[in-house]
Amino acid sequence: MVIRRLYKFCASHVVRNCSSLKCAQNIHGHNYEVEVFIETNRLDNANMALDFGLMQQEMQTFIDSFDHAHHFWDKESPEFQRFIENHCVRYVKCSFNLSAESYALMFLYYLTKILQKSVFSNNEGELKVSSVRVHETKNGYAESFLKDLENPHFKSLVHDHCVSFSQGIQSLWHDKDFFHKIISDEKQCFFHAKPLHQIP
């Protein structure tokens, strides 16, 4: 059984080294759509794989952190990086080039960590993020699958510190330790209470 939730964010970037000069040489933006697919081996007490409302919490917070921000590769020139940091309140510094494929791998990596560190209380089954799709436009998307995180090439692109968020982004988190919890060694960080009204 698989469920899907759609998230959206708007952002600007530059994709270096690609064949399209418009993308490789200019700051430009996209209205991104991120589809997150979660797989389970059984349904919970509400006959749900996972309540969609629960996917509007930590996962939503993480994806919203990329919204209305400039994303830049840490291989950009120091001058360019300083300009962004001095003139943008919201920015995300990334250790990977900013293709849709890289975003798909990155979101899969961090959303998997969030789900693994989440404690649910409604008799949920074994949950996993089976894939993530990232649409830059209506015409195409990149999709990353859980098995990709075992591929040495793909695995080398994403790690705990492959993104860092500006203070302007962090200031809107309800929990100032939100990102630290995602990448920490703690196994249980995000707790979700049992629904109040239960029919046996």
Swiss-Prot record:
Its cofactor is Zn(2+). It is an enzyme of class 4 (lyase). Binds 1 zinc ion per subunit. It catalyses: 7,8-dihydroneopterin 3'-triphosphate + H2O = 6-carboxy-5,6,7,8-tetrahydropterin + triphosphate + acetaldehyde + 2 H(+). One of its GO terms (molecular function) is 6-carboxytetrahydropterin synthase activity. The keyword Zinc applies. SUPFAM superfamilies: Tetrahydrobiopterin biosynthesis enzymes-like (SSF55620). InterPro entries: 6-PTP_synth/QueD, 6-PTP_synth/QueD_sf. It comes from the Bacteria. This is 6-carboxy-5,6,7,8-tetrahydropterin synthase. It comes from Helicobacter pylori (strain J99 / ATCC 700824) (Campylobacter pylori J99). The lineage of its organism: Bacteria, Pseudomonadati, Campylobacterota, Epsilonproteobacteria, Campylobacterales. The gene is queD.
